[in-house]
Regions:
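Intrinsically disordered, low-complexity, mixed-charge
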Residues: 1-124
Length: 124
């Protein structure tokens, strides 16, 4: 699996976000929030950033899919003022997101990216 803006790029972005959530500390929601802030800043601070661009929207969308996968597959137990987060393993994340990438949707415009809210997308 390789190639810029292909389903391999979708896999990479999504897995990157899931792994950040798995490995950063904090509550489940703070992990997701931190991953979103960090990866969105990464995407939007580049010199080639275009808020309406196909590539930018693809990357931000696939980042979100990785965070959503983590949200559905991690659990948090609260004990009085303490909490415990149980995250999936790196291997579980990689396998699940690989399966999502194999079914990635080819998109030719931003509206088609947005209409595939639960699927990984690629533009090449």
């Amino acid at each position: 699996m390789n190639g810029h803006n292909t389903y391999s790029d979708a896999f990479r972005h999504s897995l990157w976000n899931a792994l950040i959530c798995i490995h950063v500390g904090g509550t489940k929601s703070s992990r997701i929030e931190w991953a979103e802030k960090f990866t969105t800043l990464h995407e939007t601070s580049s010199g080639s950033y275009d808020a309406n661009g196909l590539e930018t929207n693809m990357d931000l969308h696939n980042n979100m899919i990785g965070r959503n996968w983590y949200d559905k597959n991690a659990t948090q137990s609260n004990y009085w003022i303490f909490y415990s987060v149980s995250s999936p393993s790196d291997e579980q994340a990689a396998n699940a997101i690989y399966n999502l990438a194999k079914n990635s949707v080819y998109c030719t415009n931003v509206s088609s990216i947005k209409s595939n809210s639960t699927k990984l997308v690629h533009i090449k």
